[in-house]
């Protein structure tokens, strides 16, 4: 019999995009107001406002992928450095490094974006 995980994995990409689609917001270090909109078609819009740099604003658009079911990889076309978030639950994601490491427990709350 086919394992439930394999069946789920086969379906996961489309489901995951629908599941994570939405707009997330938070203030990330160091004082960067961050709004990330993930669309069900696999595109994203990331807006960052740098409070410490006279509210300088940066907008990035691109495509994202689901890796391992709960890691979002945002392809960053201009710098070539991808941005990674991990899905924590239905309403929040957390910024992680390219190795999949989450921030340590003491300051992880500073790296969370919550669904708006």
Where are the model-predicted features located?
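Lipid interaction determinants
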Residues: 1-59, 73-116
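Short, conserved beta-turn/loop elements at beta-strand boundaries and strand-helix junctions
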Residues: 68-71
